[in-house]
């Protein structure tokens, strides 16, 4: 009897021990299927929301954008720059918003496929007033690239230091390609002779689009519809055909190492690149203003006030002529008197 009781007690103890060992595992299994604590839910939500935020910058000054932010930058800067093509800051933002994902890579590949372009990408030079040595450019002969460039800067009242830094292109090398294009823009102006007036900027943007295929340059051409009718007509007949022809025919201007061409004859460089300067836009605009001024004067003269002015002017001229005739008559009378007197003395 005692042995049997001991065996039963041992069995009960073993059963209790096994149940105690199973209970933590069951509790752990139950706890794994229980609702997530509030703090853990908040952490997951924060992690999901952070995916919508900007990633870390890839280079100094870089501002990464989400797709929504890039779209907003595209719409806002595009509409305002279309109305005012001289807003360089908005045009720069619009260029960066539309250059990716394809077009800036195509321009980068064009540089990589050219020996000079590859050197530019390796050295990454910047075009500023310090790097170009402005006083030296002014000492160059008039027909050189450097002198043509600095004369254009002085005539238009601009500086190479006004180009803003690229911020919205994610790839660092492509960001430099955009920066290089931006800083070379004034060299394109000097090479073609186009001024920074709206008409000249739109014409140069059309040239750049045909040569670089950057979307911003193509969209900028639509700013021609905001110009005056006379300017639109001139752009349609002269400068747009010139831009398309020369932009497609010319070599990739992004591959020009301008810093090494400063002492070269500008016409030789134009021939090498295949760029033919357009008609002088400033001279055309000057002649147009003079023609308008003469036309207004003619209209004023043909009006009532103008007729009165003409009559008064004619009367004054008639008085002057009459006075002169009177003086001439007196002179003739005096001469005749002298002749008669001398004849009488001889007689």
UniProtKB/Swiss-Prot annotation:
Name used for this protein in its record: Ubiquinone biosynthesis protein coq-4, mitochondrial
Gene from which this protein is expressed: coq-4
Cofactor(s) this protein requires: Zn(2+)
EC number(s) per entry: 4.1.1.130
UniProt membrane topology term: Peripheral membrane protein
Enzyme class per UniProt: lyase
Lineage, highest ranks first: Eukaryota, Fungi, Dikarya, Ascomycota, Pezizomycotina
Pathway: Cofactor biosynthesis; ubiquinone biosynthesis
Location of region: Disordered: 284-310
Signal sequence coordinates: none
Stated role: Lyase that catalyzes the C1-decarboxylation of 4-hydroxy-3-methoxy-5-(all-trans-polyprenyl)benzoic acid into 2-methoxy-6-(all-trans-polyprenyl)phenol during ubiquinone biosynthesis.
GO biological process: ubiquinone biosynthetic process
Keywords noted in UniProt: Lyase, Membrane, Metal-binding, Mitochondrion, Mitochondrion inner membrane, Transit peptide, Ubiquinone biosynthesis, Zinc
Family: Belongs to the COQ4 family.
Compartment(s) of residence: Mitochondrion inner membrane
Keyword Mitochondrion: yes
Binding positions for Zn(2+) per the UniProt entry: 185-186, 189, 201
Subunit structure: Component of a multi-subunit COQ enzyme complex, composed of at least coq-3, coq-4, coq-5, coq-6, coq-7 and coq-9.
Reactions mediated catalytically: a 4-hydroxy-3-methoxy-5-(all-trans-polyprenyl)benzoate + H(+) = a 2-methoxy-6-(all-trans-polyprenyl)phenol + CO2
Presequence positions on this chain: 1-49
InterPro entries registered for this protein in UniProt: Coq4, Coq4_euk
Pfam families: Coq4 (PF05019)
């Amino acid at each position: 009897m005692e042995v049997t009781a001991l065996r039963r007690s041992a069995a009960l103890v073993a059963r209790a021990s096994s149940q105690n060992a199973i209970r933590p595992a069951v509790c752990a299994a139950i706890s794994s299927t229980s609702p997530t604590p509030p703090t853990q839910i908040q952490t997951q939500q924060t992690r999901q929301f952070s995916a919508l935020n900007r990633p870390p910058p890839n280079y100094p000054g870089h501002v990464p954008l989400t797709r929504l932010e890039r779209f907003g930058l595209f719409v806002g800067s595009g509409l305002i720059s279309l109305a005012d093509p001289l807003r360089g800051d908005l045009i720069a933002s619009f260029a960066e918003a539309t250059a990716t994902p394809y077009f800036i890579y195509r321009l980068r590949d064009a540089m990589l496929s050219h020996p000079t372009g590859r050197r530019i990408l390796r050295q990454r030079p910047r075009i500023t007033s310090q790097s170009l040595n402005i006083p030296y450019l002014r000492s160059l002969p008039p027909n050189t690239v450097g002198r043509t460039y600095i004369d254009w800067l002085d005539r238009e009242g601009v500086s190479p230091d006004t180009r803003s830094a690229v911020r919205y292109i994610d790839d660092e090398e492509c960001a430099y390609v955009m920066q290089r294009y931006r800083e070379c823009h004034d060299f394109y102006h000097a090479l073609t002779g186009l001024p920074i007036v709206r008409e000249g900027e739109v014409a140069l943007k059309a040239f750049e689009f045909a040569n670089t295929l950057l979307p911003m340059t193509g969209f900028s051409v639509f700013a021609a519809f905001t110009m005056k009718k006379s300017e639109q007509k001139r752009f349609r007949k002269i400068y747009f055909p010139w831009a398309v022809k020369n932009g497609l025919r010319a070599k990739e201007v992004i591959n020009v190492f301008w810093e090494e061409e400063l002492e070269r004859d500008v016409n030789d460089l134009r021939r090498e690149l295949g760029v033919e300067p357009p008609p002088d836009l400033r001279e055309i605009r000057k002649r147009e203003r003079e023609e308008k001024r003469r036309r207004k004067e003619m209209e004023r003269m043909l009006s009532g006030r103008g007729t009165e002015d003409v009559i008064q002017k004619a009367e004054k001229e008639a008085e002057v002529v009459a006075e002169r005739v009177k003086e001439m008559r007196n002179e003739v009378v005096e001469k005749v008197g002298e002749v008669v007197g001398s004849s009488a003395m001889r007689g």
